[in-house]
A protein has these predicted regions:
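Accessible peptide chain termini
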Residues: 1-2, 135
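Sec-dependent N-terminal signal peptides of Gram-positive bacterial secreted proteins and lipoproteins
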Residues: 2-23
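Gly/Ser/Thr/Pro-rich low-complexity, intrinsically disordered segments
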Residues: 19, 25-65, 69, 77-82, ...
Length: 479
């Protein structure tokens, strides 16, 4: 073999020897690269979660990678759910205690590939979110102050509004119902059905199969009502103080305005002014009674009582006269008794009960007060109407009825004296109602009496922790 052939054979051998070595080096490089890539994937995770608290918000910050994907959604209960495309450092899996009234805790869930953080929100608070750079971070700001309403149409002409707010740490919650007069009529209901008594709002709602019911009148320790009440054209109670009332006019129009009552009894002996209707007779008064008061007047025999039908005396008693439909009892003591004494069965006794216009022709009235809103402006008439400090003096649960710009009627009940709702002063309540587009509104009895019933179910949280028996309810009944 010549030298040239020997050289060629040697070179081929060297190449053949080097090829496995090169392949080995290439394979080794691939293994190293694979290992590095794998380690990078394993280390690609959310390594840091932190938070800060300020007077107006709680900020939660996530350190995320360049290729991290995420999805943020608020759940119906207010919690904020953040889904990540990579796992979270295991040190956070036990959760994070934020210890704030708005955001008490962060729940953390993670597997080898994805993760989820649930920001527990005590209230259905609004939030903002965004990113910060260098390094990349996701932040979520949960607002401590909020105000929102949830609206739900229950049926044609009936819409429920649930209101929630938190301002400067003060929470408020109200339940409201917008009712169309086209589909519903507005009916005052007595606690005893056809008699004056106390009962729960839900019971009064059941009396008339109401779609909506809320508490209405002020009342005494007995069964007396404070304010003018008129049901289906019949007067049930009175008050000599002018008070604001809600009612239904002769043409069916809902109306809010000042209600003024006066009464006079005319006889051949002279005229006497009426002290009131279906109230407590005192030692010097002329009180009228009708069938709505109960079975009888319940008076002692210190006075004189005339049972009157069609302006004629049909019976004379000294007290505790029976009360029948179509009859009215004139019960007098003191000076009124002196004037009316000596009248007999068959004598004329004309009883006049007078209401100011347009209430004189109204079918239904609930006189309560004070007025809250007039022509879209705050108008608190508590001083004029001589409303006591127990109503005006502090934040409390509130009940009102208002007439909206569109002519619909708004039933409104605000919770109070509870952690979830502080309650409002009257002027706060008035401004709140104006925010709901109320044009005119009157305040009803509040405090532990405040209650709203929809479809037979209580939808607010009475401050007594249970239903309080009350004197009257305003209801909306399907036409």
């Amino acid at each position: 073999m010549n030298l040239k052939k020997i050289f060629i054979v040697m070179m081929v051998g060297i190449c053949l020897f080097q090829l496995p070595v090169a392949n080995a080096k290439n394979n080794s490089a691939k293994n190293i690269q694979t290992k590095i890539t794998t380690e990078k994937i394993e280390k690609s995770m959310i390594n840091s979660i932190r938070f800060s608290k300020a007077s107006d918000k709680v900020r939660v910050v996530f350190d995320i990678n360049a290729d991290t994907k995420y999805d943020v959604k608020q759940q119906p209960n207010g919690d904020i759910m953040v889904d990540f495309s990579e796992p979270i450092n295991k040190q956070y899996l036990s959760g994070i205690n934020v210890n704030d009234d708005t955001v008490p805790f962060l729940e953390v869930y993670s597997d080898d590939k994805t993760s989820c953080v649930v920001i527990k929100v005590a209230d259905n608070s609004a939030f903002d979110m965004g990113e910060l750079n260098n390094p990349r971070r996701l932040y979520i700001d949960v607002q401590k102050d909020y105000e929102y309403s949830i609206t739900k149409e229950l049926e044609p002409g009936l819409t429920q509004i649930s209101y929630y707010s938190k301002k400067s740490g003060v929470k408020q919650h109200a339940q409201l119902v917008e009712v169309s007069p086209k589909y519903f009529k507005f009916v005052p209901v007595l606690g005893g059905g056809d008699k004056m008594a106390k009962n729960t709002v839900s019971a009064m709602s059941d009396y008339v199969n109401a779609a909506v019911a809320e508490n209405a009148s002020y009342f005494g320790s007995g069964k007396e009502l404070y304010g003018v009440t008129k049901i289906a054209g019949d007067l049930v109670s009175s008050m000599y103080l002018t008070r604001t009332g809600f009612g239904v006019l002769a043409d069916g129009t809902p109306y809010i305005g000042d209600v003024n009552y006066s009464g006079i009894v005319q006889s051949k002996n002279g005229d006497v002014y009426v002290s009131g209707l279906n109230g407590t007779r005192t030692s010097d008064s002329v009180m009228l009674y009708n069938q709505y008061y109960g079975k009888s007047t319940g008076t002692d025999n210190s006075g004189i009582e005339y049972v009157v039908k069609d302006n004629k005396i049909v019976k004379v008693n000294s007290g505790n006269s029976l009360l029948r439909p179509g009859e009215i009892v004139v019960s007098a003591t003191g000076n009124g008794k002196n004037i009316l004494s000596g009248l007999n069965v068959g004598d004329d006794l004309v009883v006049n009960q007078i209401l100011n216009t347009p209430w004189d022709s109204a079918t239904d009235i609930l006189g309560v007060g004070p007025r809250l809103v007039k022509n879209g402006q705050v108008d608190i008439t508590s001083s004029i109407e001589q409303i006591g400090s127990d109503v005006t003096g502090a934040r409390a649960p509130r009940t009102a009825v208002g007439i909206l710009k569109n002519g619909n009627v708004l039933f409104a009940v605000l919770d109070g004296r509870q952690a979830h709702s502080k309650g409002m002063m009257l002027d706060e309540f008035a401004r709140f109602l104006i925010g709901m587009e109320v044009v005119d509104a009157v305040n009803f009895d509040g405090g532990g009496s405040s209650e709203l019933v929809i479809g037979g179910k209580i939808v607010n949280s009475p401050s007594d922790g249970m239903e309080r028996p009350v004197a009257t309810a305003l209801t909306a009944v399907r036409r």
